[in-house]
Amino acid sequence: MPLITLPDGNTIEFPNKVTGLEVAEKISKSLSKQATIISVNEELKDLSFVLDKDCSVKIFTSKDKEGLETIRHDTAHITAMAVQELFPGTQVTIGPIIENGFYYDFSRKEPFTEDDLNKIENKMKEIVDRDVPTTREVWKRDKAISHFKDKGEIYKAEIIESIPQGEDVSIYFHGDWHDLCRGPHLSSTGKIGKYFKLTKVSGAYWRGDSNNEMLQRIYGTSWASQKDLDEYLKRIEEAEKRDHRKLGKEMDLFHFREESPGSVFWHEKGWKLFQKLVAYMRARQEKAGYKEVNTPEILDRSLWEKSGHWEKYGEHMYTSQTPDEKIFAIKPMNCPGHVQVFNQGLKSYRDLPLRISEFGKVHRYEPSGALHGLLRVRAFTQDDAHIFCTEDQITSECLIVTNLILDIYKDLGFEDVILKYSDRPDLRVGDDNVWDKAEKALLDAVKASKLQYTINKGEGAFYGPKIEFVLRDAIGRDWQCGTLQVDLNLPGRLDASFVDKDGTKKIPVMLHRALFGSLERFIGILIENYAGKFPFWIAPLQVVVIPISEEFDSYAKEVNEKINNAGISSEVDLKNHNLNYKIREHSLSKIPLLLICGKKEVDSNSVTIRRLDTNKQENMELNLFLETFSALNKASSN
């Protein structure tokens, strides 16, 4: 007689064992129709799972994250099922869910075409119409290996061979078609619905190793309703228009070359944008009491071994051996260098907190397939800072840092921020009393922000808890940018110490802090958030002065000079093109203001302003223009 406890605390007792679906039916008929999966004592299961003991049960529908993810998982399965029905001989590999969708990797000699994707989609809808029942079987490991080898599915067999001896595996059947899978899954293919779309095909190495075969990865998205699917596809269309790689080319900001993958070639305008952000951050940090330093980009292997990075991060580091057989590594992060700066000279408790910042160039190896414009690079600049403080100062410093980060995001147009707080993992270093202080300090800072936050239990680093700052952009996408991390490990490993009030030497606590994270990545996010139409003070080129004919070139040059002298970035366009051509050209480059100069403007010592994305024009006296827009140009004053 299992006693089922529901999330609201109510209980239902059954005379005999029951399935998850029967529990849903007992609650309500409508719930049983909407149910996708259940959790039993917080473990996700199919609706067909048999409950024969007392347990806690939660029922999920497509409105829940877990329910929607199950729909996407099932859609990945019927993608593979459709492919093998249409293209016999194609081998399946893996098909996980990802954010907003799924993918499935296939081994096939012929490339999938756009026409193939349409055929696969139609076959998937046919499979949904068949409403094929889904069943689960548990097989012995060796049986599963033999079965998939006999079918010619060498990739599935290889996956199962990596499972420990003696461990059983679960196989899900959709009719006769079946796949190795942990589940859970919907009860039939008809439950998936037809609210899916295959979006693209790309290459992917088996197991992410470039030494292995190149597979074909089909991406797709799946939703609970047509409305949700349409809205998502609209967001994707808008995201493509905002793609920073496309806009970066149109706006003449940067480019990449195969000769230096993952490294940015900044053009003049792009570099101006980069420098503006650095100048803005530098000014904000100086006001907040940070001391800016610069540390070497290449450091001896011995320091990386002592810091622990060589063991934990070595595969991502670029190394070089010198003629005297010493091994050096290009830094993938700035923290060991900052500890070396702290260690110069005896430090007292009176010197703390000590806030050290750097715009440090770092290099991290990323597989070529993972590189993505400015958003995923191998060489980038961190707006890194490390705060050395006492245990008693952790709380106040965390509050100060959090407020600074949120204030800067607000200046840059990001007011919708979500915080993710991660506390101690099972495997960790440091005293539990210090962990208590560190966790309370970060959680207090999170709560004081009055922003939405999530708690990720046990997901902190082994050396300390952390906060991640997630920005939501203009089209609803989330970007993880800033971090605040308490470090109870590195200062001790690298012999950092200070003399406390009682004259004893103590190890300082170190706070890792980044606001942008990577400047390159943040610029990519800025471009996409604003679709290249930056706020006036951020824009790399703020004004273009356009004389309507050669007769007014002299006045246009004079205006341009005065604008630049006022601290506003301006150019004058004297090219031999007509006015409409120039307006189109500079509008494509997303210049915020175009100033038209003709006889009327010369006679009245004024300019006619044409703002981006409008046909309206406004005449303004030149001195008033300089006064008005100099005030907006706050990058160097904040």
Swiss-Prot record:
Lineage: Bacteria, Pseudomonadati, Pseudomonadota, Alphaproteobacteria, Candidatus Pelagibacterales
A single MF term (Gene Ontology): tRNA binding
Enzyme nomenclature, EC number: 6.1.1.3
CDD domains per record: TGS_ThrRS (cd01667), ThrRS_anticodon (cd00860), ThrRS_core (cd00771)
Species for this entry: Pelagibacter ubique (strain HTCC1062)
Localization (cell): Cytoplasm
Cofactor(s) the record lists: Zn(2+)
Coiled-coil annotated spans: none
Protein name, UniProt field: Threonine--tRNA ligase
UniProt keyword annotation of ATP-binding present: yes
Subunit structure: Homodimer.
Gene Ontology annotations for the cellular component aspect, listed alphabetically: cytoplasm
